[in-house]
Amino acid sequence: MEPSRAPVLGRLLPPLLLLLLPLYPRTRAKYVRGNLSSKEDWVFLTRFCFLSDYGRLDFRFRYPEAKCCQNILLYFDDPSQWPAVYKARDKDCLAKESVIRPENNQVINLTTQYAWSGCQVVSEEGTRYLSCSSGRSFRSVRERWWYIALSKCGGDGLQLEYEMVLTNGKSFWTRHFSADEFGILETDVTFLLIFTLIFVLSCYFGYLLKGRQLLHTTYKMFMAAAGVEVLSLLFFCIYWGQYATDGIGNGSVKILAKLLFSSSFLIFLLTLILLGKGFTVTRGRISHSGSVKLSVYMTLYTLTHVVLLIYEAEFFDPGQVLYTYESPAGYGLIGLQVAAYVWFCYAVLVSLRHYPEKQPFYVPFFAAYTLWFFAVPVMALIANFGIPKWAREKIVNGIQLGIHLYAHGVFLIMTRPSAANKNFPYHVRTSQIASAGVPGPGGSQSADKAFPQHVYGNVTFISDSVPNFTELFSIPPPTSSAGKQVEETAVAAAVAPRGRVVTMAEPGAASPPPPARFSKAVHSGWDGPTPSYQPLVPPEQRRGKPASPNTSACTQPGALHPRSEHPFPASAPRAAHRAPAGLRNPVSLPAQGLGHARHPAPLPHPAPTLDALRPAPFPLVPNGPAGAVLRVPSLSPCPEWLRNLDSRCSVISAPLTPFETSDPAGLRNTRDDRLDPARPSRTLRPSSHCLETDIVKLVSTLKPSLGFVTSDLCFVRPSECQGPSHGLWQKDVFSSCQNKEDSLSF
């Protein structure tokens, strides 16, 4: 499901690293040591940018006395000095020496006649050598580049062993650093800490996104770019720290740091292009042609970066102060950057055209990274032509790191998983990634290749430890452009429709008899089915018994049918009964309804009495396969620990023994449990005064006769429960009256 992420980076990096590590030129270190032998009469040695007052050169030269006499020439960066003589083919050795001002002590004569040179003759194995050890301080009106050359005009060539230490003051932060490198170590350490913080925050945000199944490939690539950036800065700090100590440093470490820096840039650039094309935002896969284009482009960009590093190490003239982009490879990188921006613009515009609802993300995303795309080439051009050479490296280093920090910081802010973040790009889970292809005919993407537009709408970020119930009840609107979803979890396609209870019997078991018809003796207009159950308590036991605290709703005098708003007339003897004073008051229900907002008009004919509605007994049939008892969710406000489809409504006539109940307010009778043949054993229920009834069977009894269906009736208001508070249990009791979707539909 993921595009090819420039595989050349992983395959080419190790061999390129081995190729580039030996290329670092040793002559650029500020501790310069070497053995020169040349047939020329004028040779460049090294350069250094000294401070205005604290620059110093300490040297030790040694050459055969037969090669006498040689001179050390000190040029500075004035146009009449070094630029006038370096690579000037029309000037010979004497002409190059003529631009030197002797009054400025710019010539060190390596002979015994020149006292300031510190030369003396030594003999080794029969050969006489001139050994010169001394130093020179540099003062100027500003920081200047100084260039050191060796000359012997009219001679037979040059031969010299040299060792030079060029310093700026005695501080650890300045001693071995050239003036144009001041502050680089401090800047790198500061940005290392900042990028480490960004990387840690990105890992934390990635952890949150993973918990919500929103950790997509593009965010992983951003995390990888930030991590590689941290490694790059770490190696830069190691190099500059060692350089500050001995003035040499480790060139291989610097090359490795540059490779990591370029890799971080390439990964982030690829991330931006992929996001512009809508990968993981509006599509789950880049088309084959798009993957090929990305692979070719990233391969070309990678090779250009490698060529730039090789060119800088091998072909940059140490006699000139050059910036990285002052080369054909550098200008090629600028061109590739501009091409990447054009591609980025086209991809973002296409994504916005097909998915306009993603404007809150793409508009600021496009505006922010337009500045970033232009910052790199503009910085290169300004560095090449607008920044003085004696301050270029430290300024460019700070600007370059600032550009990288801007890019990573903006991305981190725009993709933070916060409810207040209106620019969050991801709305499809990682477990619902769909294939996405190229736009179809007419520029529209095919329906089976793109993400459904806002499958989840606006993502609500809540605590990971709390389930997000809002998503359980949110149903996406049907759309013809919805892509094929691939779910990691089992799809609940075989589950019965919500709110419908499906019961099945074992094959071969006895089927329930057809519903009987009520006799029309009570009223000529009444005709309805006989309920599919028999009351457990005989009529003679129900009459004349006081109501217990757990009296069921369907046996109370004058109580409403649980699924009907029409009261049944109660007989006079039953209406006259009252609860004993020692027991709690039974639940009383209003005759007009159960707190429901809607009251349909009463039936045009009177309702029959309970005695007239009582059907003839017939065999009971279990509700589950092989006689098993099915558990169904209780719809009454008072939860039951065991509620079955064949539970009965009964009248409790006698108290229980103390050990059978834990209710401190009263005892409960379990006669209904003992008389229930379908209940395997007596099960204690939590004591409550709320109404309990078998809604499923009672509604199946009266539904055809009453001619209406109540699908979202909530039976009891919380105020009607008179039982004591039971903490969290009481919270669950009233939760069933708060969501209409929790009720059954018949």
UniProtKB/Swiss-Prot annotation:
Q: Compositional bias (Basic and acidic residues) at which positions?
A: 669-679
Which residues carry attached sugars according to the database record? Answer: 35, 250, 458
Q: Which residues form the signal peptide?
A: none
One GO CC term of this entry? membrane
Q: How does it sit in the membrane?
A: Multi-pass membrane protein
Q: Where is the composition biased (Low complexity)?
A: 567-581
BP GO terms, sorted: G protein-coupled receptor signaling pathway; response to pheromone
Q: Which residues cross the membrane?
A: 9-29, 189-209, 221-241, 255-275, 296-316, 332-352, 363-383, 395-415
Indicate yes or no for the key word Glycoprotein.
yes
In this chain, the stretch annotated as Disordered covers: 505-604, 662-684
Q: Which UniProt keywords apply?
A: Glycoprotein, Membrane, Transmembrane, Transmembrane helix
Q: Main subcellular localization, coarse class?
A: membrane
Where does this polypeptide localize?
Membrane
Descriptive protein name: Transmembrane protein 145
Q: Which organism does this sequence originate in? A: Mus musculus (Mouse)
